[in-house]
Amino acid sequence: MPPVLLQAEIIRAGPNIDEGQLVIGVAIPWFEIIREIAKDPKCRFQIPWRKLEELIAGAYEREGWERVILTPRSGDRGRDIIVEKHGIGSIRIVDQVKAYRPDRRVKADDVRALLGVLTADPNISKGIITTTAEFAPGIIEDSQLRAFMPYRLELKSGSELVKWIVNIYNMEFRGHC
């Protein structure tokens, strides 16, 4: 991946609010980074953690969520991105993003920590952990964690992340060019 893409602004930031900064759009480098990932999914491991959070926040914005919030770099209380849809059946999701190397796994304790965030805040509908890597063996089968999946808890592995963002990219350009 060309380093210049990782130095560029990839989201259009709106005003700061109590929980962080609103994301109101994506910039051209966002599309270019997704295109690079589509060509070589392993390049996702080159993305610094904050840029990965921005990339994922941009994906939620492009997916049509009404409100996308990128939380501060520190003091986010286990919430990297907050997305909301309002109206009948309002939804509020927190996404905890893990920019891990290919050999590092998200552990069960990380997943349990997110469940703690869910139970402490009654306004959260669902928690997602999105990682560039994979989850430790046994997490998906863990009966205590499984009870929350898929309606309250979602675990998005690196391969699922790639599929998700490339699909959003392809939806943007279907029928163009």
Outline where the language-model segments fall.
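Mixed-charge (Asp/Glu-Lys/Arg
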Residues: M1-C177
